[in-house]
């Protein structure tokens, strides 16, 4: 791993602390800048993961850490909450190494050594979703699950082991065709390989952020509960649970009919894969506009 040196900033908020870490480029990196902010609930003894919201192009998601709804969500799972200000989404620039270096610094600042090893859940909108998908492909063993919302430039090459990382992929019915085609194509290319992914088209919308938090949060909670081992040593690399195909439910992209592994009679290779019946029902309601 490339040697990177952090720049640190400290904030204090009542029952929690917030820290900023920036990782400047070294002479082998070309990602421009990488700035991170993290919140940890003081009542959390041992962290189990990091919920990371990623911004759209030229954005900055660091202020997400002061959002009380997200704080409550992640605290229930004993996760940290993180936002970032990042320029480059391509892992060959060294940006992935910068993320890992930032976690090492946060581990020291928060006095939570487990931050060196716990997995990420990445939820990204537009460019941020593309980043999250690329990060998942780069280091799938450190990602418990991901959400990508309506990006149009996801890497279309083989996803490798990332097919075992549960993903929720959103497209907008009225978005630009290239965005719909990019993510739909990746989904259809990898579902026959067993990718544990969901494709959800939001009807009547364009390039807007998804606000169905019941669906988003249900996916996060379900995946976290299933993928994180009941007993785990968070002070060394964590072996995340691989979810068997038989656990899943499936959903037809056209009829919106869902069914369990044993009962579903649709075309598996082009159907969404859900980690639970509840997530499948949330998808069904979302894509059908509640019909």
Task: Indicate residue ranges for each PLM-predicted region.
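Sec-dependent N-terminal signal peptides
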Residues: 3-14
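A domain-start/cap signature at the N-terminus of enzymes
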Residues: 16-50, 120-138, 153, 289-291
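Short substrate-entry loop that stabilizes the transition state in hydrolases
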Residues: 44-91, 176-180
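Loop/turn elements at helix/coil->beta-strand transitions in domains of secreted/extracellular proteins
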Residues: 45-51, 76-82, 116-119, 139-145, ...
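Cell-envelope and extracellular/periplasmic
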Residues: 52-58, 125, 132, 136, ...
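Alpha/beta-hydrolase active-site loop
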Residues: 90-115, 134
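The feature captures the conserved acid-bearing segment of alpha/beta-hydrolase catalytic domains
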Residues: 144-221
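Alpha/beta-hydrolase-fold serine-hydrolase catalytic core, especially in secreted/extracellular enzymes
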Residues: 193, 203-291
């Amino acid at each position: 791993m490339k040697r990177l040196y952090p720049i640190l900033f400290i904030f204090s908020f009542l029952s929690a602390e917030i820290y900023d870490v920036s990782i400047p480029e070294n002479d082998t990196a070309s990602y421009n800048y990488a700035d991170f902010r993290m919140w940890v609930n003081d009542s959390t003894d041992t962290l189990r993961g990091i919920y990371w919201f990623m911004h759209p192009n030229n954005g900055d998601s660091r202020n997400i850490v002061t959002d009380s709804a997200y704080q409550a969500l992640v605290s229930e799972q004993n996760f940290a909450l993180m936002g970032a200000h990042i320029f480059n989404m391509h892992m060959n620039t060294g940006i992935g190494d910068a993320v890992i270096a930032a976690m090492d610094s946060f581990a020291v600042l928060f006095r939570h050594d487990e931050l060196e090893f716990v997995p990420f859940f990445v939820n990204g909108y537009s460019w941020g979703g593309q980043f999250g998908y690329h990060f998942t492909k780069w280091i799938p063993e450190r990602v418990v699950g991901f959400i990508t919302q309506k990006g149009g430039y996801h890497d279309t090459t083989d996803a490798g082991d990332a097919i075992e990382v549960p993903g929720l992929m959103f497209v907008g019915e009225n978005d630009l065709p290239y965005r719909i085609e990019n993510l739909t194509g990746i989904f259809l290319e990898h579902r026959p390989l067993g990718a544990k992914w969901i494709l959800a088209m939001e009807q009547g919308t364009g390039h807007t952020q998804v606000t169905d938090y019941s669906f988003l949060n249900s996916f996060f909670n379900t995946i976290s509960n299933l993928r994180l081992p009941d007993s785990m040593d968070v002070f060394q690399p964590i072996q995340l649970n691989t979810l068997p195909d038989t656990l899943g439910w499936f959903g037809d992209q056209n009829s919106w009919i869902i069914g369990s592994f044993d009962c579903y009679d649709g075309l598996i290779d082009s159907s969404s894969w859900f980690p639970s019946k509840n997530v499948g029902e949330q998808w069904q309601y979302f894509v059908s506009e509640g019909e």
